[in-house]
Amino acid sequence: PMDDVDCFIGLDVGTQETGIHYPSCSVCLDGTGNLIGYYATSIAQNGEKIDEAALEKIFDQVLIAYKTKHHTYPHHVVIHRDGFSNEGIEWYVQYFQRNNIIFDLVEIRKNISTRLLHPEQISNEMNPNSGMAVIRENKAYLISTEVKPYLGAPRPLLLVHQYGSLSIQQIVRQVYILSEIHVGSMRTSRLPITTLYADKICKHHQHVPHDVLSNQLYFL
């Protein structure tokens, strides 16, 4: 497992109608990146903040799925929240303490204006290589895709570690590895498959099973 993490979970909120949002738990991955399943709730809500009832339903299903496969609950969970985590930390702390589970919460922000250049190659207008990152305290800008020189600067991901015991270096490494194992393409993805699949589930919400854990990747 990556850094003794047992389970990775992706969360996203999609808009199906004006003002109507559906949260989804993209994926329950084990610590080696193998898919356990995904869960799409049918609970509609207003705004980007996931309702606590929906959160509890999602995480209950994830824990059951993990235990069904591994015969025990995960000891350490990492949550990747697409965009901003508007839910606040308190609910997560109470929920996972109640279940005796360590957790880390990481925001994966993809729509940012920042661009990166390799400091030793600026004069040649060269782009940084895939896997390079700039780290500032609990934040990191990560280049997760390979872009050819002179074709425009790649858009990094902004990773924000909101809670937990992992180092930001460990989080960067995990996100990069999870961006390399997308089974739906021969190319690597810009996003880790946690939030990549969550985003796809939201966009195809009408075509995936609701309120039941599934491992059928219809949305790919």
Regions found by a protein language model. Give the residues of each.
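Long, contiguous domain-sized segments
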Residues: P1-L220
